[in-house]
Regions:
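Interfacial helix-start motif at the membrane-water boundary
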Residues: 66-81
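Membrane-interface alpha-helices at helix entry/exit sites of multi-pass transporters
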Residues: 71, 164-165
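Alpha-helical transmembrane segments of multi-pass membrane proteins
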Residues: 38-51
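Flexible extramembrane linkers and terminal tails adjacent to transmembrane helices
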Residues: 1-34, 50-66, 89-161, 168, ...
C-alpha cells in the first residue's frame, strides 16, 4: 500500500512539474509576442531609417530615410512581433530550465551559465528569424512594396536562395550579441545593492541602465557581423550575396583610403558599423524590451499562481 502511494505521489509530482513547464512556456510565448509587437511598432521608423542609411551610404538623419516610416509594417505586423519575441522567449526558457541545472547540478560559474543562455538565445533567434528578416529588408527597398509581394518577387528572381541569405551572419551576430549581453548585464546587476522588499523605482531604473549599457557594448562587439548581414540583405535576389569575410574585407580596403590613418579609420568604421545611432537603437530598444518582457512575465506568472490558489488542480 505504501509503495503504491509512493508511486502515485511520484507520478503526480512529475505531472505537476510537466504542467508547470508547459504553463511557463505559454507565459514566455505570450510575454515575448507582446514585447515583440510593442517594440516593433515603436522602433520601426528608426530601424527602417538605419537600414536605408547603411544601404544608400547617407546620413542617418536624412529625410529620405524617414519619408515612409511604416512602409510594409501593417502587412507584416505578426512577422515583426515574431522577430522581436524569439530572443526573449528563448532567454526566458533557458533561465527557467537551463540556468538552474547549470548552477545547482553542475556547479558552473555565473558567467558560464549566462554565456550558455546567451549562445542558446542568440543561435535559436538567428536561425528562426533570418528568413523573415530578409523579407522585411527587401520590403524596405522600394516604395509600395508589401510583405507578400516581396516574397513573390524574391522567389521569382532567386528561388529559395534569397530567403537564406544572411543566415550565417545573423547567427554570428546574435550569438556574439547574446553572450556579451547576458554576461555583462549579469555582472553589472550583481554589483547593485539588493533589497529584500519589492523592487522599487530606483532598482528598476538601475536595471534599465545596466541592460542599456550591456546591450550597447554587445552591439559594438557584434557590429562587424551586423554590417556583413546588412550588405547581404541589400544584395538583389538574383545575385549571390558577399560572404562575411568578403564584406568585411571590402570595408577594410575602403578604410585604407581615409586621409588620416588612425582617426580617419576609426571615424570610417564608426560610420559604417553605425556605432552611435545603431548602438543607441539597440541599447534603448533592448532595455525597453527586456523591461516589458520581465514585467509581463512576472504579472502572468503571478496571475497563474493566484488561479492555482483559487482553483487548485486535483
Amino acid at each position: 500500500m505504501s509503495n503504491t502511494r509512493t508511486i502515485s505521489d511520484t507520478k503526480k509530482s512529475e505531472l505537476d512539474s510537466t504542467l508547470r513547464i508547459q504553463q511557463q512556456f505559454s507565459i514566455d510565448i505570450a510575454s515575448g509576442l507582446f514585447t515583440g509587437a510593442f517594440c516593433s511598432g515603436l522602433f520601426n521608423p528608426y530601424d527602417r531609417a538605419l537600414y536605408l542609411s547603411v544601404k544608400c551610404t547617407r546620413s542617418f538623419l536624412s529625410w529620405k530615410n524617414f519619408s515612409s516610416p511604416y512602409q510594409g509594417f501593417s502587412q507584416a505586423v505578426i512577422q515583426r512581433a515574431f522577430l522581436g519575441s524569439v530572443y526573449y522567449i528563448v532567454q526566458g526558457e533557458m533561465k527557467s530550465n537551463l540556468y538552474p541545472y547549470l548552477r545547482n547540478h553542475l556547479g558552473t560559474s555565473e558567467s558560464f551559465a549566462q554565456f550558455c543562455i546567451g549562445i542558446s538565445a542568440g543561435s535559436v533567434s538567428g536561425i528562426l528569424t533570418n528568413s523573415i528578416s530578409a523579407i522585411k529588408y527587401h520590403t524596405w527597398g522600394q516604395e509600395n512594396r508589401t510583405f507578400f509581394s516581396s516574397v513573390h518577387e524574391m522567389w521569382t528572381l532567386g528561388s529559395s536562395r534569397p530567403f537564406f541569405k544572411g543566415t550565417q551572419a545573423t547567427v554570428a551576430r546574435d550569438v556574439t550579441f547574446g553572450c556579451t549581453y547576458e554576461i555583462l548585464r549579469s555582472l553589472m546587476r550583481n554589483q547593485l545593492p539588493k533589497s529584500n522588499d519589492k523592487k522599487n523605482y530606483k532598482e528598476s531604473y538601475l536595471d534599465f541602465v545596466c541592460n542599456s549599457a550591456a546591450a550597447g557594448l554587445a552591439t559594438i562587439t557584434s557590429g562587424p557581423f551586423n554590417y556583413a548581414r546588412t550588405m547581404q540583405y541589400a544584395t538583389p535576389p538574383s545575385e549571390s550575396p558577399p560572404t562575411i569575410w568578403k564584406a568585411l574585407k571590402n570595408v577594410w580596403q575602403e578604410s585604407k583610403n581615409q586621409p588620416q590613418k588612425f582617426l580617419g579609420k576609426m571615424r570610417f568604421f564608426q560610420q559604417r558599423f553605425r556605432v552611435g545611432w545603431g548602438t543607441a537603437r539597440v541599447a534603448v530598444g533592448m532595455a525597453v524590451g527586456q523591461e516589458i518582457f520581465d514585467v509581463t512575465r512576472s504579472k502572468l506568472t503571478d496571475l497563474y499562481s493566484e488561479q492555482l490558489k483559487t482553483h487548485p488542480k486535483k
